[in-house]
């Protein structure tokens, strides 16, 4: 369940009245790897398999689906993974909240150079925010979720996920690619609904995605690693304009 109805007091023009509202659900997902408690992720329930695969990929526990012997939900908020690659799993038991994308080991140690000749167009970039918004079913009811979507270079929607954490939504995108055995994904565009921080860009780069676009601003670290990795970073996509912060040669005008 991703939506919950709650009772509220609604205030308007100095008057208060009892009412109801719909809010996005946020609950903990406990991840066990090789029977060890690895992490607790605060997330919007749904697509937990994809979220877990994306998280484990970013944290360097897996490189592909071949590294996963078994993955199963033991309850609504508990998932167990058994690895085939003999990776040592330290019992860390840390909590990743909905605003923290690099609370674990993450991608701080290395940035790989992207290998992609992908190109897209000005028209495609401009069209993505509306395509993202029109497919945000839970946000349209609650106004409380971030979203990430993967598009082809011609602007066709491949997948979209919503979550209270923008990094979770990206992990779900990447986890779905792992599940479909489609990594690295070097011919697509990642579109996100909010600002573009370090964690968003680093996750996309690790998955091979060459173009990252957002409706808001990127951070300085996001720009730095996109430049170093050869990724095209686009921000403030609004109306018929946008800013290209790195590698503009991938976008034809």
UniProtKB/Swiss-Prot annotation:
Function: Required for formate dehydrogenase (FDH) activity. Acts as a sulfur carrier protein that transfers sulfur from IscS to the molybdenum cofactor prior to its insertion into FDH.
Pfam families: FdhD-NarQ
Keywords: Cytoplasm, Molybdenum cofactor biosynthesis
Protein name in UniProt: Sulfur carrier protein FdhD
Matching InterPro entries: Cytidine_deaminase-like, FdhD
Location in the cell: Cytoplasm
Protein origin, superkingdom: Archaea
Family label: Belongs to the FdhD family.
Residue ranges crossing the lipid bilayer per the database entry: none
Record Gene3D superfamilies: 3.10.20.10, Cytidine Deaminase, domain 2 (3.40.140.10)
Native organism: Sulfolobus acidocaldarius (strain ATCC 33909 / DSM 639 / JCM 8929 / NBRC 15157 / NCIMB 11770)
Gene Ontology BP annotations: Mo-molybdopterin cofactor biosynthetic process
Chief site of localization: cytoplasm
A molecular function (GO) term: sulfurtransferase activity
């Amino acid at each position: 369940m991703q939506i919950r109805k709650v009772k509220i007091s609604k205030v308007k023009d100095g008057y208060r009245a009892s009412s109801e509202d719909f809010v996005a659900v946020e609950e903990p997902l406990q991840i066990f790897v090789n029977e060890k408690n690895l992490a607790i992720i605060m997330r919007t329930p749904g697509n937990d398999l994809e979220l877990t695969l994306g998280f484990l990929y970013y944290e360097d526990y897996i490189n592909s689906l071949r590294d996963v012997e078994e993955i199963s939900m033991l309850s609504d908020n508990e998932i167990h993974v058994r690895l085939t690659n003999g990776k040592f799993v330290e019992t860390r038991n840390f909590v990743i909240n909905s605003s923290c994308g690099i609370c674990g080991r993450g991608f701080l140690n290395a940035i790989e150079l992207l290998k992609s000749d992908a190109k897209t167009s000005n028209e495609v970039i401009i069209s993505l925010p509306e395509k993202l918004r029109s497919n945000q079913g839970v946000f349209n009811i609650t106004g409380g979720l971030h979203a990430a979507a993967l598009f082809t270079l011609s602007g066709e929607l491949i997948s979209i996920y919503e979550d209270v954490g923008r990094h979770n939504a990206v992990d779900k995108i990447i986890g779905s690619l792992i599940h479909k055995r489609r990594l690295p994904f070097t011919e697509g565009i990642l579109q996100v609904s909010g600002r573009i921080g370090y964690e968003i860009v680093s996750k996309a780069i690790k998955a091979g995605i060459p173009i990252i676009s957002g409706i808001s601003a990127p951070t300085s670290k996001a720009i730095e690693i996109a430049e170093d990795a050869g990724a095209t970073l686009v921000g403030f996509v609004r109306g018929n304009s946008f800013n290209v912060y790195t590698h503009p040669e991938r976008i034809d005008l």
